[in-house]
Curated annotation (Swiss-Prot):
GO terms for biological process: peptide transport; protein transport. It comes from Streptococcus pneumoniae serotype 4 (strain ATCC BAA-334 / TIGR4). Residues 1-22 form the signal peptide. A lipid is attached at residue 23 (N-palmitoyl cysteine). Part of the binding-protein-dependent transport system for oligopeptides; probably an oligopeptide binding protein. Coiled coil: none annotated. It is found in: Cell membrane. A lipid is attached at residue 23 (S-diacylglycerol cysteine). It comes from the Bacteria. This is Oligopeptide-binding protein AmiA. PANTHER family: PERIPLASMIC BINDING COMPONENT OF ABC TRANSPORTER, PERIPLASMIC OLIGOPEPTIDE-BINDING PROTEIN-RELATED.
Amino acid sequence: MKKNRVFATAGLVLLAAGVLAACSSSKSSDSSAPKAYGYVYTADPETLDYLISSKNSTTVVTSNGIDGLFTNDNYGNLAPAVAEDWEVSKDGLTYTYKIRKGVKWFTSDGEEYAEVTAKDFVNGLKHAADKKSEAMYLAENSVKGLADYLSGTSTDFSTVGVKAVDDYTLQYTLNQPEPFWNSKLTYSIFWPLNEEFETSKGSDFAKPTDPTSLLYNGPFLLKGLTAKSSVEFVKNEQYWDKENVHLDTINLAYYDGSDQESLERNFTSGAYSYARLYPTSSNYSKVAEEYKDNIYYTQSGSGIAGLGVNIDRQSYNYTSKTTDSEKVATKKALLNKDFRQALNFALDRSAYSAQINGKDGAALAVRNLFVKPDFVSAGEKTFGDLVAAQLPAYGDEWKGVNLADGQDGLFNADKAKAEFAKAKKALEADGVQFPIHLDVPVDQASKNYISRIQSFKQSVETVLGVENVVVDIQQMTSDEFLNITYYAANASSEDWDVSGGVSWGPDYQDPSTYLDILKTTSSETTKTYLGFDNPNSPSVVQVGLKEYDKLVDEAARETSDLNVRYEKYAAAQAWLTDSSLFIPAMASSGAAPVLSRIVPFTGASAQTGSKGSDVYFKYLKSQDKVVTKEEYEKAREKWLKEKAESNEKAQKELASHVK
């Protein structure tokens, strides 16, 4: 996550946002290079069960220990992992994978346990289905027969379209062609599971602080995990591809965001290999002087961070509201599209981003769409171009809006005031009294998160006026914050009006990986983003989300022409943008000032899945000297050229897999 892509990249992960090297290959080899890597992690996992958890806190710990069928190479192409080769039928419905012989399962102590076989992948998906995986949306409507198994229509998993033809041949049968299918397979719900080991562990399987509760077939072995303290890995010396593992040890220290300066201090002392910097921190001017030739900005990631709107709030344990009428007024306001649009246009995204990136780097992280605007393209037009062409149909306020990354195309005080005036007239006619009070929760330990929400407060109150809207910041402990946002058990526990603790990273290379999560039936994510888990809630109907469902479903049915498919998904994104139910703000990772001792562009690169993120350490190379900005820029220029050539070659080779 996810990546994650997962809504697990919510609030706190932004604290450590920064792509470790944005990742590509370095031709150099230095046997004397440092073999240890140190940095931070920001949330303890609730479980190590990678098949059921879609949270980044689990991905951080498990992605380095478990290999699936594919990984990503240094240029973002899918690369063979446990799958040595693959083919797809001409109708696009049957995918067959040749399992690499000699890939083994190991205990956390490095003892060989068993060989990885095709059956382990069948076991993995069955386990995910039986345990109601948070990531089941990736497979449920794709794998033939899986939806019937999940609904109970069928109780025989052998009717599901995943088969171990023999020990070294795995086959998936799909409901409809999915050109992006293989890109899903780097995500953990499709990883293997040794059934014998799982059974032997019983209820102790995948315990969150017990490395012995898992088996490992990946580049690293988990050696230790102490809650709110540390995560430790060592190289798997018997890993099938150990030549591409250049680190011997990885040590991640827990970081709650309360001491931003600690990242640079530990980098300078040598404890950390990398440091995300915060230009608004008290020591930044000193750091900038000391490292003036070394600070560079990473590339913007594919994940999105923004603000969710709770359309069905039920709990008020953390609130500044003193009367029921204030609660009713806020709910009515948030159900009003013009009011939500006023908030959307009132957010100064550059100021919001500047709270962690500083003024110089603020624009680099700004994002105006839920789907990254250049995530896919239809001919010469990016996805953002397709959306921009359709938005004006919803109103003149969308004419000429620039949706590209790296600039704030939505902040417009005049538009915000105009939309608010329409909302106020309608709400007053409905008996609503002003100002509207908006409760926004923050983790009191996270300085940069608090500063972003304070920026949101300032933008909204300045543009709309405190006589109209008041943003009430609710400070609480880290655990309290997580329990009413990220880890909330259900929608009734989502105790907020607007939440900045929401973000998403794509899981596979198709717009649906973003847009599906806000369908009314995606309760695991709609509760976190929009405060509801009942698809038939009156609030859901009132804001028109059933129309959004129709648009997304119509796009999903288009499988023969990708350009038409992307046009239809752009229609769904246009509806979502106009609805302002989710207020986009910035990329959830990257576009950040950093210091690094990682060789630039060494590591797996990908916009999707769990094998190209900033938490996957295969391929990474460390060096003694701090990377200079000049070195980074030269490496980036070289990498971009090589990447374009490599991606084109990989695209042409796809045809050879159609049988």
